[in-house]
Amino acid sequence: KWHSRFTEKEIRYLPQHPFIPGWLRLERALGDFRLQREDLERWFPEFISLRGTRIGELSGGEQRILECFIILRSPARFILLDEPFSQIAPLHVATLQTLIRQEKATKGILLTDHMYRHVTGIADRLYVMADGQAYPCENDEDLVRRGYLNHL
């Protein structure tokens, strides 16, 4: 199958780049991951009007939402999300944050994103990567001290 490297039950990974082939239709992509279109449409009602659409016809933001949804709603015990908020409209960022909050109750989630403000409200713990090491981050001042931000 086209998605076999993403179907492990223990861990799933959302890469930075699109991973669903453009020739697939929305329903096929969801079905291959044993997810229901209606579940996606409850979270993101805009997808109701996109029924039958090929993945390659979706906007970059729509495709990113779909990929995030597929990975987050999978039965995996641990999820890796690389830049999940990239190309996502502010309205959908809030919905995606709510989905992440819900899913983290039953699985471990490791999230990396440059848009740190999207992460601070949903993370249990924050770390800054600098000089090949991970440093705990307690507040915005830690982000400045570690060189992630120039100033507040």
Language model regions located:
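Q-loop/switch helix immediately C-terminal to the Walker
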Residues: 17, 22-37
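Conserved ABC ATPase signature
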Residues: 54-58
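ABC ATPase C-loop
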Residues: 71-72
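ABC ATPase NBD coupling module
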Residues: 1-12, 17, 147
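Hydrophobic anchor residue at the start of the ABC signature
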Residues: 67-68
